[in-house]
């Protein structure tokens, strides 16, 4: 109340921003007569001068220069638009362009020309010479907007590209991203970023920078889709026959002759005879060539499966599946699988079907993808209700832009009925009345199910209508455009048709414009406002009204008792409704509660993803270093060798490594043979002093002797790609482990432990293990690589080229779907303060806390049924 009074006296923060922007508008308008007099060539030359000025400025000062040239850039862009598009930017659109350039969100009502507004900020920021991304919610809008604005951009000397799901060719994508301005969907931009970080050449990466992005329908992308990460997943190993072949080879090998078993350390060491036998059975000349790395790995796992793991002790076979027996509890660990191909090796051993595991190869949330941009801005018709979240999560201020013409739409109070049947009966009557009159009506529903229900009722009444939901998404734009025709009745889910204007004829305006009927309040006020905003564009007349019932989800869970009591006191009969500002306010308060719950939920999930994001950035940075031909990969390998040896010697019992027992020396000899392919005689180890130096020099000389057949360029290339392969495999395994950790961490909340703290702690330890695994695995792999002659090195290069090509084009699945993180949120609620007795139960059953979890504790599966 006090805040509102102060706002009226001195103006709100938004008012002060608009006042500042209006001063700039006067400056831009003053330049209009000058540019109007110029020929097309003169106008283009003037814009080229701005490009030269900005690009000649030092990079860290370019933003300052952009602000200096903003009036000229906006004025030239407006003049060019008048000539090319026959559209002149209004003053309020100039304000919108400045808001976007400042890295804020421009809240502009439907029909205010957001597509044209974007051209001002895009043209200005593209002066720097870095690609500007314009992000939309679907392929149709990306294609439409880019094609409509392309002539303007071409006039200004810019190239334009559009990324859609239909662009499959990598070279074509690379070409599109080389353009000055790139339109595309949020999904395509996000997936391309992930794909870039799976490439084996810097030249193949399509996104060269993340300088500036304008996100259209920013609330939909950064709020509604914030909880659904982009995931690229794929099979762990596509060649399932390798497991069966390796199992055959392992079963044919003899203990002591072909391999030895170290039961104490649960390891197996293949002898020279065993290697020869395996090479013969696999049909290869050298098991440890790069191209045979997968076979040697499968053989290692098959030997472990056959000689170290035993049925009814380590695992059982049930229902054609291998089920792990927990070594500590003796219980079955259903759903768990051994990693690194061991589980598949056991399946091959037992003759059951081998499961091709699908695991996460790369993932990112939109929150973390878009926060990478140096400057980010957005546009939408509805952002103020989520202003706090935009600021806290993305550091984006929301600025409400005044409309060019006053809004004439009438927003009527909600009508509330006792039952859903009564509500729908009233809706059908209203639709029939409007249809008979010829006034177009757009009916918003909360789900496909409800739209189908309404469709059946209208069909029964023989009222012609069109249904728009996920089943007809390909016709979305066409259906929405026709929603303003005389007598049109359109049923749509609340989010349908965003970005498509419903234009009205003068006849329709005389009839009262587009009539909006909402059949249910959404959990978010913003979605309701979007539905209302379909009507009343650019000063058009229109009406909106919501029809509710006590059986609606929102009213059933929040506050329906009070409203129900009012209805009973009034003695309302079937079919009658109540209409009151107090009731409407009660519904909006219920929505605020739900919005706050969702905000806290998204904030918690982001805190979890931030942990993984820091790890992701670190890995991707190192990956880019490896891709750089100037990176000293040999020094990295030497560093890893030193680390691996330190780990080995640190595990030896004797403090003085010069006085190792014969058993320890024998163990060291076996480790050097098994892990590093180093043949060292026992007497040489006994005589060595200091032993660490002897072993280090032995491994180094063995490696350098192997690499002599390669020239420096070949060596660097092979080392970099092999290291990338090791890094990628380890990263995939790490993501798999992190997924498992996240799945189980939610239960800690019921033990009064903060799941987030536990997750941070354990994920950090896992990341340290991941780094250690890379170092150890790298040196093991490089130690086992063999090049006997130049032909071997050429074969290796060809293999690596094919491997890189296959990896970049491997069969993967792209997912952008709801995650199972609801459990996480419920756990957080369990950890946080207990709700009051009469508050809604946090398990979302719709009951009060005292009648639900307060009595019985959280329901099985965390959700009440």
Curated annotation (Swiss-Prot):
Family note: Belongs to the SecA family.
InterPro entries named in the record: Helicase_ATP-bd, Helicase_C-like, P-loop_NTPase, SEC_C_motif, SecA, SecA_CS, SecA_DEAD, SecA_motor_DEAD
Disulphide bridges, residue numbers: none
Cofactor remark from the record: May bind 1 zinc ion per subunit.
One annotated GO biological process: protein import
Protein name: Protein translocase subunit SecA
Pfam families per the UniProt record, alphabetical: P-loop_SecA (PF21090), SEC-C (PF02810), SecA_DEAD (PF07517), SecA_PP_bind (PF01043), SecA_SW (PF07516)
Binding-site residues for Zn(2+), renumbered to this chain: 841, 843, 852-853
Subunit relationships: Monomer and homodimer. Part of the essential Sec protein translocation apparatus which comprises SecA, SecYEG and auxiliary proteins SecDF-YajC and YidC.
Membrane topology of the entry: Peripheral membrane protein
The EC number(s) this enzyme carries: 7.4.2.8
Sequence positions that bind ATP: 93, 111-115, 501
Domain of life (superkingdom): Bacteria
GO molecular function list: ATP binding; metal ion binding; protein-exporting ATPase activity
């Amino acid at each position: 109340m006090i805040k509102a009074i102060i706002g009226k006296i001195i103006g709100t923060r938004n008012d002060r921003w608009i006042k500042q922007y209006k001063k700039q508008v006067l400056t831009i308008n003053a330049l209009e007569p000058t540019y109007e007099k110029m020929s097309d060539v003169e106008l283009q030359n003037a814009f080229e001068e701005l490009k030269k000025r900005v690009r000649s400025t030092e990079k860290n000062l370019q933003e300052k220069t952009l602000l200096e040239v903003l009036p000229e850039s906006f004025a030239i862009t407006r003049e060019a638009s008048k000539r090319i598009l026959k559209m002149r930017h209004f003053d309020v659109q100039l304000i919108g362009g400045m808001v976007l350039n400042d890295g804020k969100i421009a809240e502009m009502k439907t029909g205010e020309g957001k597509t044209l507004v974007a051209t001002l900020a895009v043209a200005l920021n593209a002066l720097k010479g870095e690609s500007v991304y314009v992000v939309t919610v679907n392929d149709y809008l990306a294609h439409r907007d880019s094609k409509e604005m392309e002539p303007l951009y071409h006039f200004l000397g810019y190239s334009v590209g559009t990324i859609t799901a239909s662009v499959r060719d990598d070279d074509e994508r690379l070409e599109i991203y080389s353009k000055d301005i790139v339109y595309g969907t949020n999904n395509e931009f996000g997936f391309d970023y992930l794909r870039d970080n799976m490439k084996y050449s810097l030249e193949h990466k399509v996104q060269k920078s993340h300088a500036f992005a304008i996100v259209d329908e920013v609330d939909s992308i950064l709020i509604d889709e914030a909880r659904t990460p982009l995931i690229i997943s794929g099979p762990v190993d596509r060649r399932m026959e390798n497991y069966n072949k390796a199992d055959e080879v392992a079963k044919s090998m003899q203990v002591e002759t072909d391999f030895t078993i170290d039961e104490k350390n649960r390891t197996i060491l293949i002898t020279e005879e065993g290697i020869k036998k395996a090479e013969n059975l696999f049909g290869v000349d050298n098991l440890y060539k790069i191209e045979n790395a997968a076979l040697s790995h499968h053989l290692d796992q098959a030997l472990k499966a056959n000689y170290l793991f035993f049925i009814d002790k380590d695992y059982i076979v049930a229902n054609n599946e291998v089920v792990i027996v927990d070594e500590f509890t003796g219980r079955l660990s259903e759903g768990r699988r051994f990693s690194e191909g061991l589980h598949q090796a056991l399946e091959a051993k037992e003759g059951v079907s081998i499961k091709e595991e699908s695991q996460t190869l790369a993932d990112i949330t939109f929150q973390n993808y878009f926060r990478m941009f140096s400057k980010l801005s957005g546009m939408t018709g509805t952002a103020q209700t989520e202003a706090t979240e935009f600021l806290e999560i993305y550091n984006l201020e929301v600025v409400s832009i005044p409309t060019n013409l006053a809004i004439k739409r009438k927003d009527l109070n909600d009508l509330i009925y006792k039952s859903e049947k009564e509500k729908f009966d009233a809706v059908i009557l209203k639709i029939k009345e409007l249809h008979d009159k010829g006034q177009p009506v757009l009916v918003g529903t909360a789900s496909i199910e409800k739209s189908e229900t309404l469709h059946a009722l209208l069909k029964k009444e023989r009222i012609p209508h069109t249904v728009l939901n996920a089943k007809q998404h390909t016709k979305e734009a066409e259906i929405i455009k026709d929603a303003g025709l005389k007598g049109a009745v359109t049923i749509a889910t609340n989010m349908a048709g965003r970005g498509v204007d419903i234009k009205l004829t003068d006849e329709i305006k005389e009839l009262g414009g587009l009539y909006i009927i909402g059949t249910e309040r959404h959990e978010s006020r913003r979605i309701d406002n979007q539905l209302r905003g379909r009507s009343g564009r650019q000063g058009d007349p229109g009406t909106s009204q919501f029809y509710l019932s006590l059986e609606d989800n929102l009213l059933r869970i929040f506050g329906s008792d009070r409203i129900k009591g009012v209805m009973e006191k009034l003695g309302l009969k079937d079919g009658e409704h109540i209409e009151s500002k107090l009731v409407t306010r009660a519904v909006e308060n219920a929505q605020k509660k739900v919005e706050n719950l969702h905000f806290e939920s998204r904030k918690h999930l982001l805190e979890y993803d931030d942990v993984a994001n820091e790890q992701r950035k670190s890995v991707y940075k190192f990956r880019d270093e490896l891709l750089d031909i100037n990176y000293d990969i040999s020094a990295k390998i030497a560093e890893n060798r030193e680390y691996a040896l330190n780990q080995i010697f640190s595990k030896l019992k004797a403090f003085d490594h010069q006085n190792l027992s014969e058993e320890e020396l024998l163990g060291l000899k076996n480790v050097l043979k098994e892990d590093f392919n180093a043949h060292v005689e026992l007497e040489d180890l006994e005589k060595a002093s200091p032993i660490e130096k002897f072993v280090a020099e032995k491994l180094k000389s063995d490696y350098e002797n192997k690499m002599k057949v390669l020239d420096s360029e070949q060596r660097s290339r092979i080392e970099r790609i092999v290291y990338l392969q090791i890094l990628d495999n380890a990263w995939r395994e790490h993501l798999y482990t992190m997924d498992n950790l996240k799945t189980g961490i939610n239960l800690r909340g019921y033990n009064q432990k903060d799941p987030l703290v536990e997750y941070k702690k354990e994920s950090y330890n896992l990341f340290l293990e991941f780094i250690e695994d890379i170092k150890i695995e790298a040196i093991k792999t490089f130690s086992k690589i063999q090049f006997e002659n130049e032909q071997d090195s050429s074969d290796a290069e060809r293999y690596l080229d094919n491997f890189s090509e296959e990896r970049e084009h491997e069969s993967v699945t792209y997912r952008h779907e709801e995650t199972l993180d609801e459990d996480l949120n419920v756990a957080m609620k369990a950890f946080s303060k207990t709700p009051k007795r009469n508050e809604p139960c946090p398990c979302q059953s719709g009951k009060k806390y005292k009648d639900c979890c307060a009595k019985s504790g959280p329901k099985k599966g965390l959700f009440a049924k």
